[in-house]
Amino acid sequence: MVDQLQGTWKSVSCDNFENYMKELGVGRASRKLGCLAKPTVTISTDGDLITIKTKSIFKNKEISFKLGEEFEETTPSGRKSKSTVILDNDSLVQVQDWDGKEATICRRLVDGKMVVESAVNNVTCTRTYQRV
């Protein structure tokens, strides 16, 4: 499944992103900038190491990890979290834990597009990406 997600993807649609960021505690100005961003995501592998690079006008971010192994990351909003990524059916599922809270980011292929669903509490954001 990771092989199918490898490559470069450009954001083509976004639903409920501002509310998702608000639920994360992101300030108003950063939420507005984040909503304007049309990120490009590149997913690659080197053996069992997976790297996800996200580039936008707002911020750039890179994480590298092995499936099932916890790692530390700093999110674009500045949160420091412990994350674990697993392969669940046809989805790459990332769980971020910080300060007793949890967010889930699920990446999967739907009709040739990468769909990323991010959820915290009862707020879900869906971003759709097209292969570049």
Curated annotation (Swiss-Prot):
Q: Does the keyword Transport apply?
A: yes
Q: Name one Pfam family in it.
A: Lipocalin
Expression sites (tissue/organ): Highly expressed in adult retina and testis.
Q: Which UniProt keywords apply?
A: Lipid-binding, Transport
Which parts of the sequence bind a fatty acid?
R107, R127, T128, Y129
Q: Which GO terms describe its molecular function?
A: lipid binding
Q: Which family does it belong to?
A: Belongs to the calycin superfamily. Fatty-acid binding protein (FABP) family.
- What does this chain do? May play a role in lipid transport.
What protein name does the entry list? Fatty acid-binding protein 12
- Origin species: Mus musculus
